[in-house]
Design a protein with these regions (language model features):
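C-terminal helical/coil "lid" or tail adjacent to the Rossmann-like core of SAM-dependent
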Residues: 4, 9-12, 17-19, 30, ...
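Conserved alpha-helix/loop element of class I SAM-dependent methyltransferases that forms part
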Residues: 28-45, 62
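Class I SAM-dependent methyltransferase SAM/SAH-binding core
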Residues: 50-52, 56-108, 133
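Helix-to-beta-strand junctions that scaffold the AdoMet/dcAdoMet cofactor pocket
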Residues: 68, 127-128, 142-144
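A short acidic, Gly/Pro-enriched loop at the edge of an enzyme's catalytic core
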Residues: 108-117
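A short SAM/SAH-binding and catalytic strip from SAM-dependent methyltransferases
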Residues: 116-130
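A short glycine-rich, Lys/Arg-flanked "PGG" loop and its adjoining helix->strand segment in the class I
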Residues: 132-147
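Conserved catalytic/acceptor-binding region of the Class I
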Residues: 147-216
């Protein structure tokens, strides 16, 4: 999801239908797996919350339901395409307590001290060098006693079994591409430390594994970054065709591939 920043920090993942479906799948799993942490962070009926780096808005129905008609959800993303997709989702679902605006994760345009909770999911890993500035800005948006809610991944530990050589190559190229951009592919491991450096009290720092077999329409972030990798010269169109054939091969196999991905969540409270 796009946090935004200088032009060279442009979000690398293409927002195609498969990527939108991946966001939706992640949102469904998150609501179930993180219910107690949402409550700890104050994401409950009547709360005013923000989803920063909201992407196409997959998390917005769950947040809208969590805060109820008396609450408010402020969604922000730096990518105009994602903002348009999120607004379309909000309109189609009739989410009257949700607004969507364009803004950067380190300059959201939201009023300081106006939120009970601010959520940032899978943004820090795509904004290498700006992580502390983003967390510091979001910390100013929550009222005293309010919470900042961070979610990210350890991308170096993601595995797919059974392995397929071409898809392993794709994942390794993606890791090298991210490193060359200055991104932190282990951002999830540092969430609690970033909250503490922003002056917040760390209430919870938790890890879990996603283990699942995504539907054929859902491919990993490395695939969504294929055009950016070609543009950067770390992959060719022949590579993209080879990787596409590999996905089709594993999707047609008798045993579907299983993804293992470590996810981390940290909740920090602003001192009263």
């Amino acid at each position: 999801m796009s946090g935004g920043g200088p032009e060279e920090r442009r979000y690398a993942l293409e927002l195609d239908p498969g990527e939108v479906e991946r966001y939706r799948m992640m949102a469904e799993q998150a609501r179930a797996a993180e219910a107690d942490l949402w409550d700890l962070a104050g994401i409950r009926p009547g709360a005013s919350v923000a989803d920063v780096g909201c992407g196409p808005g997959a998390m917005l129905p769950a947040l809208s339901d969590a805060v109820g008609p008396e609450g408010r959800v402020n969604a922000v993303d730096a990518d105009p395409e994602a903002v348009a997709a999120a607004r379309a989702l909000v309109a189609a679902a009739g989410l009257g307590n949700v607004s969507v605006a364009e803004g950067r994760a380190d300059h959201t345009g939201l009023e300081p001290g106006s939120l009970d909770a601010a959520m940032l999911r899978h943004v820090l890993a795509h904004n290498g060098g700006a992580e502390d500035a983003i967390v510091a800005h979001l910390a100013t948006l929550v009222r005293p006693g309010g919470c900042l809610y961070l979610v990210d991944v350890d991308g170096t530990a993601i595995r797919t079994l059974p392995e397929q050589a071409d898809l392993t190559d794709l994942q390794e190229r993606y890791g090298a591409f991210r490193a060359a951009r200055g991104d932190d592919n282990r951002a999830g491991l540092r969430l609690a430390d970033r909250l503490a450096r922003a002056g917040l009290e760390v209430l919870e720092f938790r890890g879990r594994y996603f283990i699942g077999q995504p539907p054929p329409s859902v491919r990993p972030p490395s695939w969504a970054a294929r055009e950016a990798m070609v543009a950067a010269g770390v992959a060719s169109e022949d590579d993209v065709r080879r990787w596409d054939r590999a996905f089709q091969e594993v999707q047609g196999a008798p045993v579907a591939p299983t993804i293992f991905a470590p996810l981390f969540t940290a909740v920090g409270r602003r001192p009263a």
